[in-house]
Amino acid sequence: MSCTRMIHVLDPRPLTSSVMPVDMAMRICLAHSPPLKSFLGPYNGFQRRNFVNKLKPLKPCLSVKQEAKSQSEWKSPHNQAKKRVVFADSKGLSLTAIHVFSDLPEEPAWDLQFDLLDLNDISSSLKLHEEKNLVFDFPQPSTDYLSFRDRFQKNFVCLENCSLQDRTVTGTVKVKNVSFEKKVQVRITFDTWKTYTDVDCVYMKNVYSSSDSDTFSFAIDLPRVIPTEEKIEFCISYHANGRIFWDNNEGQNYRIVHVQWKPDGVQTQVAPKDCAFQQGPPKTEIEPTVFGSPRLASGLFPEWQSWGRVENLTSYR
């Protein structure tokens, strides 16, 4: 096909005799022939679709979970500081004062002090155990010094002091210094002299030196179980110069008896089961007075001499 025929197809209008290339290009651009529009139609639709797609917003490549946002919103109220209102006085101190009140009234300090008489009753009621129901049935020999001195001069041996504590009998014995070699023993029985035991005494150095007397000590453990019908008695023997001197408490022996404690604190001797208790003549007992006195001190602590016995305070001679 020649160029002239092509131009007639695009534009049927008449052409000049001379056709320039510019004229042909202008006709092609300005021509509205149906074949060209139909040819360019699909391309225009593709451009419009591309333009619409370019206007759409792009999706982000990172996705944020909604849970993190909800948790942050849930925690945010706690992070906020709570508002507080504090009232103060003129000096800036708090107006709040706390006072604690007790339903029970406080007792004065003087009510906490023990009454000596009540304390004595309590201690007496506690002595109901078997280990505490043994006592001496004789006064301390050194309490009456005049009698002790006479017996010492006559028998050459005499029990000086004796104590019973934790089922152990301890004491001291005074002997006359008749020879250098001496032997002092305590003969004791726990079954009314069916059997007996001789316990050696130990020499003690005299605190107050005396050339005519010596002091010995002893300690005897009592059996754990002693029948109440059996008698517990002991005496002192002194061996010197081939002779034996005895101190048997003027023939009565030194006895340890079972006693029964009563709620009022009074001690009564337990009678044997096989025979009635023979009560002897009443003995002179020391009655304790309130808050202590010379009489009470001499009864509880015989080694403490009082002004009432100042006439008896002489040496062991």
Swiss-Prot record:
Keywords, ordered alphabetically: Carbohydrate metabolism, Glycogen metabolism, Ubl conjugation
PTM comment, free text: Ubiquitinated by NHLRC1/malin in a EPM2A/laforin-dependent manner.
Intrachain disulfide bonds: none
Molecular-function GO terms, alphabetical: glycogen binding; molecular adaptor activity; protein phosphatase binding
Residues of the CBM21 domain: 149-257
Presence of keyword Ubl conjugation: yes
Task of the protein: Acts as a glycogen-targeting subunit for PP1 and regulates its activity. Activates glycogen synthase, reduces glycogen phosphorylase activity and limits glycogen breakdown. Dramatically increases basal and insulin-stimulated glycogen synthesis upon overexpression in a variety of cell types.
UniProt name for this protein: Protein phosphatase 1 regulatory subunit 3C
Protein source organism: Mus musculus
Name of the gene: Ppp1r3c
